[in-house]
Amino acid sequence: MVVFVNKLTLIGKPEELERIYAHVAEFMEEQPGLIRYQLLRSQKEPGTYFNVAEWDSNESFDKALAEPEFRARLKALGTVIKGEPHMSDVVVEGVAR
């Protein structure tokens, strides 16, 4: 498993980001290899969001990103956010007892 973490800095309206993100997420939910995702808004800095997505592999993630439909939906995100993407490995994992 790999985790995609993208720090998003808002340059547009929050409502617009959330609407566009939902449109992109609708497509991603159908992609093989996506385990789960979340869009998080910072309590400390409301103009900062984090997109966190778990994938079964880098290959599944890369395949989804290469889809023309994804590229088309992604263009709109660039009008409302500036991203800092990071593909990450899980090094410690836990659950509450």
Language model: regions and residue ranges:
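Glycine-rich beta-strand-turn "strand-cap" elements at beta-sheet edges
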Residues: V2, Q38-F50, K75-R97
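Active-site-flanking beta-strand signature of metal-NTP-handling nucleotidyl enzymes
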Residues: V2-L8
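Short coil/turn motifs at secondary-structure junctions
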Residues: I11-K13, S42-K44, D56-N58
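Short, surface-exposed ligand-recognition loops at beta-strand->loop->(often short) alpha-helix junctions
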Residues: T9-R19
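Intrinsically disordered, low-complexity acidic/polar segments
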Residues: E15, T48, S60-D62, A96-R97
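Short flexible/disordered coil segments
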Residues: L10, E69-A72, G94-R97
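An amphipathic, aromatic/His-enriched active-site/gating alpha helix that lines ligand/cofactor pockets
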Residues: H23-R36, E54-S88
